[in-house]
């Protein structure tokens, strides 16, 4: 017993020293996290975390920066050990294959009559490239890779095939699905597992480069459903049918979901709420709570459309890179981006969004992995820790105190307790917070609760009756928000020479102590001994 008590004291002193070093120059403010634990407000998929692989060739450049290198579906080094380990760590990772060029891709199936040629840059035509092709040899290699890494694959199909594009971007005609059906059949006959087939990329609403009306898109989606039903008639479960994979517009999505009826399993929208990657004010937006709150409107609107329509589809974020046109170096691939990314994951969960696909797994300046050496960027570790700690049920959570704290709570993945995510967007103030459990709420998550009522919850003791919690404090190396090295409890997260990922280990804190959130830091708090009705 004495040994354990001494060990607990040593651990506490280590934690205290770490926190003291990170906040010594800061002012301190108290706050309270209120968690409504009687019922979940949102439920996410078990494989909620998703990332994208794109089609962009090395010639893809934005604002004079060429950030894609060999990160395309067609040229990515599938033998890279770090890449394989990074995917395996999620067990499984959902990967959505798609992007702008998917709508000018043909598939080299045995019955294809067209030559299989690579994309060629041509700025005078739609999307800036000539038609490209997916060789079936490469498709074989990709599927061997997916099987080896345990990847769950969502494949985005070319939805412009057969249509003509007017000068104003309007796409005329129905989807010619001949090549797509042949590709789907080839995939099934080779026993390649696809979890979902998605129709088109950013063709809904106003579109990006081209657009398809909601009524026609619904007809095309029904045709995709019929193809999937034919090809997979003896397969269970069938792949999902997904669409439209574009930017959210209320009227378009309302019409589409009502007319697509039950042909659709998941409706996908894209999010680039931070604006262009060239914007000099990206960090200001990321650290502004009011700016972060704005995306809640679209989450709420889509949730309501689904609720009030005849569809059985669920909401997904099919692609989200924050800053469009490949992001911004040392921002979207640096520590500061985790404030935006984790806030998005938390907000999406609250509004019952089942899957969230980050643009990208690798490629551009917003990849979870470095494009050239494959080492994980900070957001990779943020996603991995989320995956390990945050369970499927999202709990309504508010914070009373500074507006610079973002707070989210889920039932824990590893226990019947809860995991609280706290992010401090302030650069000088250390926040010392306590957690209280409540059984009533009346306002949205962006507002403070005005009245509280204690819930009946239970706390169970650990060894020797000492109740402990597990904390994961994430900070930037040297306090630099532009750093691409993330510290976990003061230690750098880095792969070793063998390409192995570092262990994700918490510090243990006596649960009677408040939670300390240092300036510009992120804290995951696993409270395995807090039992609330929603998580029981």
Swiss-Prot record:
<dbReference type="GO" id="GO:0004566">
    <property type="term" value="F:beta-glucuronidase activity"/>
</dbReference>
<feature type="active site" description="Proton donor">
    <location>
        <position position="202"/>
    </location>
</feature>
<keyword id="KW-0378">Hydrolase</keyword>
<keyword id="KW-0964">Secreted</keyword>
<dbReference type="GO" id="GO:0005765">
    <property type="term" value="C:lysosomal membrane"/>
</dbReference>
<protein>
    <recommendedName>
        <fullName>Heparanase-like protein 3</fullName>
        <ecNumber>3.2.-.-</ecNumber>
    </recommendedName>
</protein>
<feature type="active site" description="Nucleophile">
    <location>
        <position position="319"/>
    </location>
</feature>
<feature type="glycosylation site" description="N-linked (GlcNAc...) asparagine">
    <location>
        <position position="122"/>
    </location>
</feature>
<dbReference type="Pfam" id="PF03662">
    <property type="entry name" value="Glyco_hydro_79n"/>
</dbReference>
<feature type="glycosylation site" description="N-linked (GlcNAc...) asparagine">
    <location>
        <position position="438"/>
    </location>
</feature>
<keyword id="KW-0325">Glycoprotein</keyword>
<feature type="glycosylation site" description="N-linked (GlcNAc...) asparagine">
    <location>
        <position position="30"/>
    </location>
</feature>
<comment type="similarity">
    <text>Belongs to the glycosyl hydrolase 79 family.</text>
</comment>
<keyword id="KW-0472">Membrane</keyword>
<dbReference type="InterPro" id="IPR017853">
    <property type="entry name" value="Glycoside_hydrolase_SF"/>
</dbReference>
<feature type="glycosylation site" description="N-linked (GlcNAc...) asparagine">
    <location>
        <position position="191"/>
    </location>
</feature>
<dbReference type="InterPro" id="IPR005199">
    <property type="entry name" value="Glyco_hydro_79"/>
</dbReference>
<feature type="signal peptide">
    <location>
        <begin position="1"/>
        <end position="24"/>
    </location>
</feature>
<feature type="glycosylation site" description="N-linked (GlcNAc...) asparagine">
    <location>
        <position position="427"/>
    </location>
</feature>
<feature type="glycosylation site" description="N-linked (GlcNAc...) asparagine">
    <location>
        <position position="176"/>
    </location>
</feature>
<feature type="glycosylation site" description="N-linked (GlcNAc...) asparagine">
    <location>
        <position position="265"/>
    </location>
</feature>
<feature type="glycosylation site" description="N-linked (GlcNAc...) asparagine">
    <location>
        <position position="510"/>
    </location>
</feature>
<keyword id="KW-0458">Lysosome</keyword>
<comment type="function">
    <text>Endoglycosidase which is a cell surface and extracellular matrix-degrading enzyme. Cleaves heparan sulfate proteoglycans (HSPGs) into heparan sulfate side chains and core proteoglycans.</text>
</comment>
<dbReference type="GO" id="GO:0005576">
    <property type="term" value="C:extracellular region"/>
</dbReference>
<keyword id="KW-0732">Signal</keyword>
<feature type="glycosylation site" description="N-linked (GlcNAc...) asparagine">
    <location>
        <position position="308"/>
    </location>
</feature>
<feature type="glycosylation site" description="N-linked (GlcNAc...) asparagine">
    <location>
        <position position="370"/>
    </location>
</feature>
């Amino acid at each position: 017993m004495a040994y354990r008590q001494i060990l607990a004291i040593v651990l506490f002193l280590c934690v205290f020293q770490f926190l003291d070093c990170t906040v010594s120059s800061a002012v301190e403010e108290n706050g309270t996290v209120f968690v409504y634990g009687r019922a979940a407000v949102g439920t996410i998929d078990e494989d909620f975390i998703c990332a994208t692989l794109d089609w962009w060739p090395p010639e893809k450049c934005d604002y004079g920066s060429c950030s894609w290198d060999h990160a395309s579906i067609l040229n990515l080094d599938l033998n890279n050990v770090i890449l394989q380990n990074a995917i395996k760590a999620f067990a499984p990772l959902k990967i959505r294959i798609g992007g702008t060029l998917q709508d000018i891709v043909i598939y080299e199936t045995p019955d294809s009559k067209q030559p299989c040629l690579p994309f060629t840059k041509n700025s005078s035509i739609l999307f800036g490239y000539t038609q490209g092709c997916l060789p079936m040899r490469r498709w074989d290699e990709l599927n061997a890779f997916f099987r080896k890494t345990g990847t769950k694959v969502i494949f985005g199909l070319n939805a412009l095939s057969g249509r003509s594009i007017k000068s104003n971007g309007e796409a005329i005609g129905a989807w010619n699905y001949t090549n797509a059906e042949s590709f789907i059949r080839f995939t099934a006959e080779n026993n390649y597992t696809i979890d979902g087939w998605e129709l088109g990329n950013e063709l809904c609403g106003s579109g990006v480069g081209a657009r398809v009306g909601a009524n026609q898109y619904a007809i095309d989606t029904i045709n995709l459903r019929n193809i999937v039903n034919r090809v997979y008639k003896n397969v269970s479960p069938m792949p999902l049918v997904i669409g439209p994979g574009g930017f959210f517009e209320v009227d378009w999505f309302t019409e589409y979901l009502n007319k697509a009826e039950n042909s659709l399993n998941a409706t996908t929208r894209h999010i680039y709420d931070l604006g262009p990657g060239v914007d000099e004010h990206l960090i200001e937006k990321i650290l502004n709570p009011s700016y972060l709150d704005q995306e809640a409107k679209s989450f709420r609107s889509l949730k309501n459309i689904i609720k009030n329509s005849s569809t059985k589809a669920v909401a997904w974020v099919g692609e989200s890179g924050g800053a469009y046109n490949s992001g911004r170096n040392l921002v979207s691939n640096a520590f500061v981006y985790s404030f935006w990314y984790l806030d998005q994951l938390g907000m999406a969960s609250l509004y019952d969004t089942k899957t969230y696909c980050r643009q990208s797994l690798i490629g551009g300046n917003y990849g979870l992995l470095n494009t050239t050496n494959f080492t994980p960027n900070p957001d990779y570790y943020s996603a991995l820790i989320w995956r390990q700690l945050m369970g499927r049920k999202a709990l309504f959570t508010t914070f009373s105190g500074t507006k610079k704290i973002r707070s989210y709570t889920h039932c824990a993945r590893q226990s019947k307790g809860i995991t609280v995510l706290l992010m401090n967007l302030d650069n000088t103030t250390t926040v010392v917070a306590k957690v209280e459990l409540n059984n009533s709420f009346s306002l949205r998550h962006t507002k403070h609760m005005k009245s509280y009522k204690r819930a009946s919850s239970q706390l169970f003791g650990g060894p020797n009756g000492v109740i402990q919690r597990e904390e994961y404090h994430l900070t930037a190396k040297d306090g630099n928000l532009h750093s691409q090295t993330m510290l976990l409890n003061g230690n750098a997260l880095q792969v070793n020479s063998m390409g192995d990922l570092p262990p994700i280990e918490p510090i243990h804190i006596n649960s009677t102590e408040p939670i300390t959130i240092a300036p510009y830091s992120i804290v995951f708090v696993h409270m395995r001994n807090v039992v609330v009705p929603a998580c029981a």
